């Protein structure tokens, strides 16, 4: 009589161990992301946390002078856990044929598939960084990186990683300021670093490329702790047997969510490749108009979207809902944004068009919001 043994079966615990052992190996940005286990074993799938605004520098106060208290303000940000999942099917013939290790290979590929999805979302978090953290340049060089580091202000030191594509790495290798891997120290953030420039470990990735949504190509300088990965549950593996087909289906899932925790630890070296329309994200990003005095409004540009060097925001108020501006064509008729406190005449106007333009008035970002004028 034939006896079924574990050699004839796919053991879920074994597959789970194989996946857990490989999970994370394919996430390029994992060393730059802090792990947050707040939701592990807790009810709920949403994590809320405060984002505080700086109260401003201290003032000089004369003897017996009054100290005016400042206001500590915070906005709440929330992130909701995602379920990343993938499945494969292995027939009995494939498993028993003796060619290769289909179960082991399938497990490794499932882990890679989950890593791929998480890594893509981590990079998406970086791509969503505001333009205030962007240094616009047409080429990658050691000088460009040195200039971009000024966006860290008085805190340029510490460990940093420069994420580039193959072409960027090739350009840096020809630069006299390039430090080869053999001349670098041993305390590295990323073990796959190819070299160093101005204290930035250089890491090559195929995810640095033209982004069709943002119409940008971004190279990133990232400090550890800029990103967070909220974990809800580790890899979950389930095996489904389909006897009518004589095959096993292996399902793997991972519950977590990445998000940009500290934007001040990210600088993007940006090449604009087209005109990005931000109207659909305007409210989420913080673009809006606020009613001012009678017949007037205030045009609000969020701090994280302050214009980078060489660029400025312009606006136009009218009654047309259609987006304004065309890439490669100078925009005419806009008024320079004079700050969020400036009162703008808005009587009879229904739409406010905001455009980020360069020194030649060529727009790279455009959006439209409703006009709210004072009664």
Pin down the residues of each PLM region.
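N-terminal "assembly arms/tails" that initiate or stabilize quaternary assembly
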Residues: 1-74
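Short beta-strand elements bearing conserved aromatic residues within extracellular beta-rich modules
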Residues: 311-315
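Protruding loop/beta-arch "assembly-hinge" segments enriched in small, turn-prone residues
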Residues: 1-32, 214-216, 220-225, 229-276
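Extended oligomerization regions of viral-like shell subunits
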Residues: 43, 48, 143, 149-236
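Beta-strand-rich modules
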Residues: 346-367
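Acidic, Ser/Thr
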Residues: 300-310
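Alpha-helical scaffold segments that mediate packing/assembly in large oligomeric complexes
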Residues: 90-157, 267-276
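Surface-exposed, short loops/turns at beta-strand junctions within beta-sandwich domains
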Residues: 336-350
């Amino acid at each position: 009589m034939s006896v079924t043994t574990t050699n004839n079966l796919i053991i879920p615990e074994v597959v789970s161990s194989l996946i857990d052992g490989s999970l994370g190996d394919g996430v390029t940005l994992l060393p730059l992301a802090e792990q947050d286990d707040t939701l592990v074993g807790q009810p709920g799938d949403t994590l809320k946390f405060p984002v505080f605004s700086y109260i401003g520098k201290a003032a000089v106060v004369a003897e017996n002078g009054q100290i005016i208290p400042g206001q500590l303000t915070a906005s709440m940000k929330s992130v909701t856990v995602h379920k990343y999942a993938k499945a494969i099917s292995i027939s009995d013939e494939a498993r028993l044929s003796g060619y290769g290790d289909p179960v082991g290979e399938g497990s490794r590929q499932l882990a890679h598939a989950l890593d791929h999805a998480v890594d893509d979302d981590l990079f998406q978090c970086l791509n969503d960084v505001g333009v205030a953290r962007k240094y616009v340049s047409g080429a990658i060089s050691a000088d460009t990186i040195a200039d971009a580091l000024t966006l860290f202000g008085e805190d340029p030191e510490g460990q940093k990683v420069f994420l580039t594509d193959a072409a960027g790495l090739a350009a840096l290798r020809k630069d006299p300021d390039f430090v080869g891997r053999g001349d670098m120290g041993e305390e590295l953030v990323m073990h796959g670093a190819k070299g160093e420039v101005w204290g930035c470990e250089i890491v090559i990735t195929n995810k640095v490329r033209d982004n069709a949504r943002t119409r940008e190509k971004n190279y990133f300088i990232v400090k550890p702790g800029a990103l967070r990965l909220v974990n809800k549950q580790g890899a979950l593996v389930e095996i489904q047997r389909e006897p009518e087909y004589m095959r096993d289906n292996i399902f793997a899932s991972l519950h977590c969510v990445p998000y940009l925790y500290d934007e001040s630890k990210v600088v993007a070296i940006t090449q604009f490749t087209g005109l990005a329309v931000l109207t659909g994200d305007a409210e989420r990003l913080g673009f809006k108009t606020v009613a001012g005095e009678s017949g007037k409004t205030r045009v609000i540009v969020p701090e994280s979207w302050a214009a980078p060097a060489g660029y400025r925001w312009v606006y136009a108020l009218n009654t047309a809902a259609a987006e304004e501006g065309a890439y490669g064509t100078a925009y005419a008729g806009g008024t320079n944004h004079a700050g969020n406190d400036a009162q703008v005449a808005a009587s009879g106007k229904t739409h406010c068009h905001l455009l980020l333009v360069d020194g030649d008035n060529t727009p790279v970002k455009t959006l439209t919001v409703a006009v709210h004028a004072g009664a």
